[in-house]
């Protein structure tokens, strides 16, 4: 229910303001608006104010503004001057562009509001490299500072991760790093076309790199877990398993995963004294029917390292909204690059998310707090704005192309050309929606 409410609220805000952008500019341009609807389907709420009927409909996947238009039915003589299609192309361009531009402006405001409460940045340092992953095979080491990805400078962990994932399926990715010793080198990721690369989207961009270092100290013990039954407590330092020293938490995690139902003899330190316990990991079946072991222990992060890579500060209000502008421009450009790579075949369609994934992320971000939810809204608003500006018929961007061509030519494009374009655009969007729903279902099933 929490996830559903977070998703519905997001749609109401983002779609309402997108459509309100169209509405307000249409009114300013002298166009009569007949209906303003948030949601599709038969309205369950309607209210008439002036010439406009305001509606809420049950399918929260979009909305629309219906204007007087002679192409969509008979228009009275009195309403002809207020018909959308009778306006100068410049006015129609302004009306159509207003929706997505409102989304982009909203993103600036949402980011600015979030940043005004405070900002936490993670410097682009590698804390942990998980064994036997894409990152491990590329040679990444703990302490590496990521400086660039395929020549593009990166300033923080988020931008480094985004650039790596964006380029991963296009070919080799050259990651410029400064090692812990201060040497400059390049880590080359060569995973294009591999099964692992295809799973990156499902793993939320995870390639085996983490900014945090984790110790061999237990940070948490789940109630009722094998670890609790064996007497382990937070603060215990794991030293050996089955007689072999534990050098890292990853070694311990790999051992337990590979030992479902098997007894493990664990040595650990507590308050300077060495203890021994026998643990038998629970057997957990994954979505692919493989069995793994689970003991219910969480690691404790390295707090000294955390303090080194984390930077928290509170910018002035003016600076916060300036950062909101920069973030919006950056994410808009990243989104455009992704669509470009998608068209060229250098990015997988598995990265496309549908309403189920968006709803899930909405719920997660809302649980993390107001700032996280505001930044989620901003990111989705950018996606909505950029997507609608793409020059695809049926989208706002496609209409912008038609009206710009009409303005240049002095007459509209032929009806046949427009109809072919609309059919193509509709087919493309239906295909994209089908892929998004398919990806949602496969993620849901693991």
UniProtKB/Swiss-Prot annotation:
Limits of the PDZ domain: 100-181
Location of the active site: 19
Keyword list, A-Z: Cell inner membrane, Cell membrane, Hydrolase, Membrane, Metal-binding, Metalloprotease, Protease, Transmembrane, Transmembrane helix, Zinc
Transmembrane segments: 93-115, 376-398, 419-438
GO molecular function: metal ion binding; metalloendopeptidase activity
EC number: 3.4.24.-
Protein name: Putative zinc metalloprotease NMB0183
Organism for this UniProt entry: Neisseria meningitidis serogroup B (strain ATCC BAA-335 / MC58)
């Amino acid at each position: 229910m929490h996830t559903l409410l977070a998703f519905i609220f997001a749609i109401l805000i983002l779609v309402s303001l997108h459509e309100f952008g169209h509405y307000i500019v249409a009114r300013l341009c002298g166009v009569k608006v007949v209906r303003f609807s948030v949601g599709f389907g038969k309205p369950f709420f309607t209210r008439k104010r002036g010439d406009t009927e305001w509606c809420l409909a049950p399918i929260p996947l979009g909305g629309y503004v219906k204007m007087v238009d002679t192409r969509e039915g008979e228009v009275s003589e009195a309403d002809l001057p207020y018909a959308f299609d009778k306006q100068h192309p410049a006015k129609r361009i302004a009306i159509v562009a207003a929706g997505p531009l409102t989304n982009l402006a909203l993103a600036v405001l949402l980011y600015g509001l979030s940043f005004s409460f405070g900002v936490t940045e993670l410097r682009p340092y590698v804390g942990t490299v998980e064994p036997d992953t894409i990152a491990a095979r590329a040679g990444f080491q703990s302490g590496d500072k990521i400086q660039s990805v395929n020549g593009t400078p990166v300033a923080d962990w988020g931008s480094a991760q985004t650039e790596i994932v964006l380029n991963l399926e296009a070919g080799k990715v050259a990651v410029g790093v400064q090692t812990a010793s201060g040497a400059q080198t390049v880590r080359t990721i060569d995973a294009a076309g591999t099964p692992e690369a295809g799973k990156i989207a499902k793993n939320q961009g995870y390639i085996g790199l983490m900014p945090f270092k984790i110790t061999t100290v237990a940070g948490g013990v789940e109630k009722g877990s094998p670890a609790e039954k064996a007497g382990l407590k937070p603060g215990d330092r794991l030293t050996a398993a089955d007689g072999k020293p534990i050098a890292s938490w990853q070694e311990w995690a790999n051992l337990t995963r590979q030992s479902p139902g098997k007894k493990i003899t664990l040595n650990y330190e507590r308050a300077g004294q060495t203890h021994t316990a026998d643990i038998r990991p629970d057997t957990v079946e994954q979505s692919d029917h493989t069995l793994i072991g689970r003991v219910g222990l969480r690691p404790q992060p390295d707090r000294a390292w955390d303090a080194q890579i984390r930077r928290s500060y509170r910018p002035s209000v003016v600076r916060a909204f300036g950062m909101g502008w920069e973030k919006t421009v950056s994410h808009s450009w990243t989104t455009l690059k992704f669509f470009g790579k998608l068209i060229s075949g250098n990015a997988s369609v598995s990265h496309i998310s549908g309403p189920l994934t968006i709803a899930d992320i909405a719920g997660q971000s809302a649980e993390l707090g107001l700032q996280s939810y505001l930044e989620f809204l901003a990111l989705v608003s950018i996606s909505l704005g950029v997507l609608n500006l793409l020059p695809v018929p049926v989208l706002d961007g496609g209409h912008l192309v038609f009206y710009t061509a009409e303005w240049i030519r002095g007459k509209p494009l032929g009806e046949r050309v427009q109809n072919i374009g609309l059919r193509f655009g509709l087919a493309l969007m239906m295909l994209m929606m089908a892929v998004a729903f398919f990806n949602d279902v496969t993620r849901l099933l693991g």
